[in-house]
A protein has these predicted regions:
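Conserved P-loop
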Residues: 2-93
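Glycine-rich loops and low-complexity Gly/Arg-rich segments
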Residues: 43-45, 61-65, 103-106, 163-165, ...
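P-loop NTPase motor core
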Residues: 86-174
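Conserved GTP-binding G-domain of TRAFAC-class P-loop NTPases and closely related GTPase folds
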Residues: 149-217
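A general structural signal for short secondary-structure junctions and capping/turn motifs
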Residues: 8, 28-30, 72, 129-130, ...
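Short, well-ordered beta-strand core segments
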Residues: 36-38, 137, 183-185
Length: 217
């Protein structure tokens, strides 16, 4: 049986993740995408003239709103989930409720976190279906400074990571990054300037920068 071989770029909708510290402009940037509809979980779009779904009050409601776009892709060209932090918290709450326990730790042996990762994966699968329907998907996330251990001459240092649960068994931040076609990090660009009088370095600047490749910041 012969299979046809295609060559060249295949135009498709994009899966984009934007993360950065609070107030950097993640929502503003997401609103620049073509004809966006927001699933605004934190009320971040109150001052924006954008289309939005009702704020989801549960994990299931979030999945239902995503499914609505999958069934009716003509309603927008970009679906924005703002933010992944809230989605993760709703996912954990759903797993706890479904398991009839009081805490994610009550499952024992890290099973609760594994269940949460599997459940979050369902959301990413649904979002992939939205992309396959021709709609861009943008997911925003807050960032937090964490210590990063590197087994080489660089040793350990602090760097910005998504403010999502991270462990050896369950790394939802890594899952989200692997899912995305494009991972963008927004931050303030600062530089150190020595004070002539005290000879101490002070941080100056504050220009907003979007990093599109890996950066130790």
């Amino acid at each position: 049986m012969a299979f046809p071989i295609n060559r060249g770029i295949v135009p498709t909708a994009k899966k984009v993740v934007i993360y950065g510290p609070e107030g950097i402009g993640k929502t503003t940037f997401a609103a620049r995408f073509p004809n966006p509809v927001f699933i605004d979980t934190e009320g971040s779009t109150k001052e924006y003239d954008v289309a939005r779904f009702p704020a989801p009050t549960s994990w299931q409601m979030l999945l239902d709103e995503v499914a609505e776009v999958k069934k009716n892709p003509q309603i927008c060209r970009t679906l924005v989930i703002d933010t992944a932090d809230w989605a993760e918290a709703a996912c954990f709450a759903h797993v706890i409720s479904a398991g009839q326990v009081k805490s994610i730790e009550d499952f024992g042996y890290g099973k609760g976190y594994v269940k949460a990762k599997e459940e979050f994966g369902k959301l990413l699968n649904e979002l992939t279906e939205v992309v396959n329907a021709g709609v861009n998907v943008v997911v925003t996330a807050h960032a937090a400074m964490r210590k990063f251990e590197q087994p080489d001459e660089m040793g350990s240092y602090d760097r910005w990571e998504m403010k999502l649960y991270t462990s050896q068994k369950t790394n939802i931040a890594a899952l989200l990054k692997e899912w995305a076609d494009m991972v963008l990090f927004a931050n303030y660009k600062t530089f150190a300037v020595k004070d002539k009088n005290s000879n101490k370095a002070k941080a100056q600047g504050g220009q907003r920068v979007m990093y599109t490749t890996h950066h130790p910041c």
